[in-house]
């Protein structure tokens, strides 16, 4: 259960997990932009799978902070 209530914006209701998803997506974009110049993607076997796992880990960390 999250600490945040359901948000209603212009008649649309958004569950608290929606904002956690958006926040983790913003952090994911930032981390991906920081990792790209380092050349870490040269050592990754499957970049799309790596990005998916990175996003899942970030989402888990963000969601654990708000519980």
UniProtKB/Swiss-Prot annotation:
Keywords: Cell membrane, Membrane, Transmembrane, Transmembrane helix. Pfam families: DUF1656. The lineage of its organism: Bacteria, Pseudomonadati, Pseudomonadota, Gammaproteobacteria, Enterobacterales. The keyword Transmembrane helix applies. The gene is aaeX. HAMAP family: AaeX. GO terms for cellular component: plasma membrane. It comes from Enterobacter sp. (strain 638). It is a multi-pass membrane protein. The chain crosses the membrane at residues 3-23, 43-63. Belongs to the AaeX family. The keyword Transmembrane applies. It is found in: Cell membrane. This is Protein AaeX. InterPro entries: DUF1656 (IPR012451).
């Amino acid at each position: 259960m999250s600490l945040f209530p359901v948000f209603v914006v212009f008649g649309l209701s958004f569950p608290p997990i929606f904002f956690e998803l958006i926040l983790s997506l913003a952090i994911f974009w930032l981390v991906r932009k920081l990792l790209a110049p380092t050349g870490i993607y040269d050592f990754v076997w499957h970049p799309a799978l790596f990005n998916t796992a990175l996003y899942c880990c970030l989402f888990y960390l963000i969601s654990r902070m708000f519980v």
